[in-house]
Amino acid sequence: MSQPIMLPQGWEARWDPQANAYIYVDQSTGRSQWEVPLNPTFPTSPTPHAPPQRHGRRAYPSAMYAHAYDTPAPHVGPPQPVAGYAEQGTPQFITPGFEGQQPVQQPPYAAVDHVAGQFQQMNIAPGAAPVAGAAAGAYQGAGYAEKQLHSTKTKTVNLIGLQPDVAALDNPPPPALLPANASVTSSAHSQPDPSYQRCTLNAMPTTQSLLNKSKLPLALVMAPYRSIRETDNDPDVPVVEDGVIARCRRCRAYINPFVTFIEGGNRWKCCMCGLSNEVPQLFDWDQRAEKPADRWARKELNHAVVEFVAPTEYMVRPPQPPVYAFVIDVSSAAIQSGMVAVAARTILESLDSLPNADNRTKVAIIAVSTSLHFFSLPADATEAGMLVVPDLTDVFLPKPVDLLVNLTESRPAIESLLAKLSDMFQDSHTVGSALGSGLQAAHQLIGKIGGKIIALGASLPTIGEGVLKARDDPKLLGTSKESQLLNAGNNWYKTFAIECSKNQVSVDMFLFSGTYTDVATLGCLPRYTAGQTYLYPGFNASRSEDAIKFATEFGKVLAMPIGLEAVIRVRASRGIRMSAFHGNFFIRSTDLLALPVVPQDQNYVIELQIEDDIKGSFVVIQTAVLHTTCYGERRIRVITQAMPTTDSIAELYTSADQIALATYLANKAVERSMSHSLDDARNHVTNRLGEMLTVYKNQVTSAAGGASAQLAVPENLLLLPLLCCALTKHVGLREGASIPPDLRAYAQCLLTTLPCQTLIPYIHPRFYSLHNMPPEAGTIGGDDGAMILPPALNLTSEKLERHGLFLIEDGQNIFLWVGHDAVPRLIQDVFDLASYHELQGGKYTLPRLDNPFSERVCNVVDKTREMRRGVYRPQVYVVKSDAEPALRSWALSLLVEDRMDRMSSYAQYLTTVKSKVNGS
C-alpha cells in the first residue's frame, strides 16, 4: 500500500473527479494547484546522445541499391540533438529558475555558416514510429476531454541543438485545468473538440495588463461548421429538438454545462454574467413520451457542441431554399481549355447530390462572354431556350420567369442544357469576358431569395461591369510595392460583395486562366460573402489530372450541406470582449458576423481583449451560429468553451496552444502584408515570436537581464518557432521576385480560411521516405483500423537519398521525389517503367500495379489525399532529382528547415530569434 502524502501545514488535497486527480488548495489564500506542494527536487535530465557525425560526401555502395527500397528502416528512438548544434552531454531540459546550475556550452553563433554546414552534414534517422493515418488530427474526434493529459509543471526546453520532433504537431493542445465541479455534469464532452474551437491560451489572464506583459496573443480559432467524417469516427452534433431553449435574460447566453442550478433546481445562474434565470417549465419534461425527463441527461448540459432547433421567433422570414446560380465563362479561352465541358458535366452528374431533400432547390445558369446568355428552363419543357443580352452597361433580366427554376420540376430542361452547353459555344472565337456583368445579373435573379453564385472564369474580366486590367508588373515583384498587387484593383467588387451580403447571397470563385487573373481582386467577392476561392492555374482538361482534380473538388462543393442566411455571435464572461475578426464574412455590427452561406470546414479567427479585471476562477466563451440548414430547418449551433483564470505568466505560457498561435499569426501576417508590405509581414511573425520568448526568458526562467547561449521555450511551444520559420517561407509571404501575384494571392486566401487540421500541413508539409518505409506502412492496422503512414521526417534535403523515393505533401500538392540512382526494380514496381530515364516528371497519375510495394505506395498517396477535412484533392507531381529547375525548386521549397534563396535555414532562424531575445 502506498504511503500517504504528507502536505505542508495549511494545505489540503481535494479529489477532482473530472480530472481524475487531486487538486491541492492553500487554505490561507484559496490558491489551488495540481502539483503536490512539497519541497521540489530537480532530477538531472538524461544525457542525450548525439548521433555519429559523418564527414564529407556520403558514399552509396552499388551493392545496396538493389534492396534499398524494400528494406524496412530500423527502429529508432526519439529525435536526438543534431551534432554541431550543441555539444554531447548538453541537457536539453531546463528547470525554471535553476538553469544556472546546468552549464551549457554552445557553439559561437557568430559562425552561422559553420553551424549551418554542420547541420547539413547530418543524416538523422526519423524519430517516430509509424503512425496511423488518422493520427494527423487524431485528437479531433469524440471525447476530447478524455484525452487530455494534466501537466503538473512547466518544462522548459533549449531549442539550440535540438532537432524538432515534427510528429508532435499532431499532439492535442494543453488542457484547460478547470476547478473541481466547474461543470454540472461529469460528461467527457463538456469541452469542445479543438477542431471546432480552440484558444491561443487555455488559461485566461485576469487582467489586460498581465496579457500585455506576457506578449501572448489572445484569440479564438474556430471552424464551427466542421464536417463530420466517418473515417475519423466523428460523432454527429447532438440536436435538441423539443424547442426548449434556455437563455440568460441579460447576456442572452445559452444554457450549457458550466451553469449553476440554484433554489432547489428551479433557477439557474448564468456562468457569464451571473444573473439568476428561471428554468423553463418543459426543461424536465419528455414531450415525446409525455413523462418527466432526467435533467442531467439533457444534451445541452453534457455537450460543449450542440444544436437547437429554433422556433419561429428566430426567423424573420420562412427558411430560404438552397439556390444555385451558375455564371460560366464561355469565351474562347474557356472553351479551348475544356473548362466549360468539365464544369457542365460535373454539374450534370451532381444534380442528385445538390441538397434537395424537400424538392425546394432552385437553379439558374448564365453563360458570359462579350454578351450575357440567359437560359429559359420551363417546367414542362425538355429543351432550354437561350436569350442573349448584349447590353452590359445596364444589366436587365430578359424574362421575368423560367430563368431561376425549381430543380425537380425543370430537371429535363436543365439536363438537356448541360449536356450540350460546351458544344453550343464550340465555334466561338470571342475574346473577352463580361464576368462582372454576369455576376450582377445572377444577383438580380436570386437577390430576393438569397443563395449562392458559383462563378467560373477563364480570363480576366475586360468588358462590362468590374473591368480589370493586367497589373502584374514584374518590376513590382520582390519590392515593397508588391503588396499593391495583393489588394483589390477595382472597388466595384467590394461594393458588389457588400450588396450581395445584405441580400444573403454568397459567391464562390473558380478561376482557371493560364495568364494573370487578378485573384486578389476577384477574391474580394468570397471574402465578404463567406464564400471560397479556387484556383486552377494553367488548366487544361486534356490532361486527365487537371480534369479529375477540378471535377472532384467542384463536385464536393456542389454536394456540400451548407448553412444559409447565418449570423455568428461570440459571447464571453464579463470583462472579455471581441476586438478583431479574421475570415470570410461581413461584419454587420461590432460583434455580429453575417454569412449568407456557411460552408463546411472554413476557419475564422477572433481576437479577444480584457476590458475589466476578471474575478472568477474560470471564464466561459460561447459561439452561436444561427443558420438555416439546406433542408429548410432553422437551427442554432452553440459551442461553449471554459478555461481557468490565472494571474501567473508562467501558467499562461504553460497553457499556450502552438497550433492556435500559428493560425493566428498566419492571419495577422496576411493582414499586414496587405496593409504594409510582405517584408513587414515576415518581420511581424518573427518579432512576435521574439517578444514571447523574451518575456518567457525574463519572467519564467532565471536568465533575466543577461545574454544566454540557450533559447528557452516551454515544452508546449516547442514547435512554434519551426512553424513561424515555415510561415515566413510560405509562398503567401516569402521573399522573392519569381512568385506570380495570382499564386501568392491564392495562397493568402488559403492561409486565412483553412481549418487548423489542413492549415498546419499547408504551412509545414509532411515528408515521408517510401523506399524503406516500415513493412506495416501503407497497410491497414492500429486499434482504429486506419491506414498506417510512414514516420514523418524533418523537412530538410539532408534526408533525401540518391537511390530513394520520397513523398512531400502540403494538402494542395503531392510531390514524389525520385532519386537519380533509384534501382530499376523500384521504378518498375511503382511506375511500371523499365528505368529511371524513361520516367517523365510533372503531373502524374500513379498506376496501381499488381505488386505489394505499388499497393502500399498507392495506399499512402490515397490516404494523404483524403486524410483531412475539406474539398481539396492534391495533385501528384513526379519530381526527378535531376528534373527541370522550376519543378525541382518548387518541391525543394517545401523543405523549410533548409536555406532557401536569401532566407535562412531553421538553425539560422533560431539564431536570429535568440539574438532578439538577448536584445542584441
Swiss-Prot record:
The WW domain is annotated at 5-39
Record keywords, A-Z: Cytoplasm, Cytoplasmic vesicle, Endoplasmic reticulum, ER-Golgi transport, Golgi apparatus, Membrane, Metal-binding, Protein transport, Transport, Zinc
Q: Which GO terms describe its cellular component?
A: COPII vesicle coat; endoplasmic reticulum exit site; endoplasmic reticulum membrane; Golgi membrane
Keyword Endoplasmic reticulum among UniProt keywords: yes
Q: Does the keyword Transcription apply?
A: no
Source species, domain of life: Eukaryota
Where along the chain is Zn(2+) bound?
248, 251, 270, 273
The record gives the membrane topology as: Peripheral membrane protein
Q: Transmembrane ranges?
A: none
Q: Where in the cell is it found?
A: Cytoplasm; Cytoplasmic vesicle, COPII-coated vesicle membrane; Endoplasmic reticulum membrane; Golgi apparatus membrane
Principal cellular location given in the protein's record? cytoplasm
Q: Which GO terms describe its molecular function?
A: SNARE binding; zinc ion binding
Annotated region (Zinc finger-like), positions in chain: 248-273
Q: Which GO terms describe its biological process?
A: COPII-coated vesicle cargo loading; intracellular protein transport
**Which family would the database say this protein is a member of?**
Belongs to the SEC23/SEC24 family. SEC24 subfamily.
Complexes and interactors: The COPII coat is composed of at least 5 proteins: the SEC23/24 complex, the SEC13/31 complex, and the protein SAR1. Golgi apparatus membrane; Peripheral membrane protein; Cytoplasmic side.
Function of the protein: Component of the coat protein complex II (COPII) which promotes the formation of transport vesicles from the endoplasmic reticulum (ER). The coat has two main functions, the physical deformation of the endoplasmic reticulum membrane into vesicles and the selection of cargo molecules.
Q: Please identify the protein, giving its name as recorded.
A: Protein transport protein SEC24
Q: Which organism is it from?
A: Cryptococcus neoformans var. neoformans serotype D (strain B-3501A) (Filobasidiella neoformans)
**Lineage of the species this protein comes from:** Eukaryota, Fungi, Dikarya, Basidiomycota, Agaricomycotina
User: What would be the name of the gene that encodes this protein?
Assistant: SEC24
